[in-house]
A protein has these predicted regions:
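Short helices/loops that flank or line small-molecule/ion binding pockets
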Residues: 34-39, 53-67, 72-80, 169
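An extracytoplasmic/periplasmic, membrane-proximal ligand-sensing/linker region
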Residues: 39-42, 126-187
Length: 187
């Protein structure tokens, strides 16, 4: 496939024939691909793999048609796999010619691999704010930025611990809804 629209057109013309790799059944890639299918109006078959490298090898070998993967794989397997879209809300600086999913015509909520820092419940709000400020400062150090770029990561901090809690709630809500609709979790 040369583009997301080609992939979607193929899937719609050949119902049930598109297969896509997932890192474990019910993982983030599986849930996001299920959400994308619902929004774009096609249905494919999830093929589970033990991890990203196995899935990339499945794409290269033609065992699967596509797979949602972290950016490091696009960078590592350059020339062997074709990135079709960035799932985030903006193009990725390391692959500037690859459009976002929205630019490709699928208006799915943006997605990214993300993580966060947590502290014990009941942590003094002043201490939480100080930790957040320290993380913001460290995240701008040139050595930290260089390390993240070298491993195909971007760092975007929320502005406050409260915003991070809201992100957690939002992510859990869509994952629960998609997982339940796909029969991956009990309703």
């Amino acid at each position: 496939f040369q583009s997301v629209s080609e992939l979607v057109d193929h899937a719609k013309r050949n119902p049930g024939k598109l297969n896509f790799g997932v890192i474990g059944v019910g993982g983030i890639e599986h849930l996001k691909m299920s959400q994308i299918q619902r929004i774009a109006g096609f249905k494919g078959l999830a093929i589970p793999y033990k991890g990203g490298p196995d899935g990339v090898n499945g794409v290269i070998a033609g065992e699967i048609d596509c797979m949602l993967l972290p950016g490091i794989f696009a960078k590592t397997f350059a020339g062997k796999v074709r990135p079709l879209a960035i799932l985030g809300d903006q193009r990725w600086q390391q692959l500037p010619s690859v459009p976002t999913l929205a630019e490709s015509g699928i208006q799915a909520p943006p997605a990214s691999y993300w993580g966060g820092w947590s502290a014990p419940a009941g942590l003094n709000p002043k201490t939480a704010s100080e930790l957040a400020a320290l993380l913001a400062k460290v995240s701008q150090r040139p050595d930290v930025v260089a390390t993240l770029n070298a491993t195909a990561h971007e760092l975007r901090l929320t502005e406050s611990p409260g915003q991070f809690r809201q992100k957690l709630r939002s992510e859990l809500a869509w994952m629960t809804e998609v997982g339940a609709s796909e029969g991956l979790i009990a309703k």
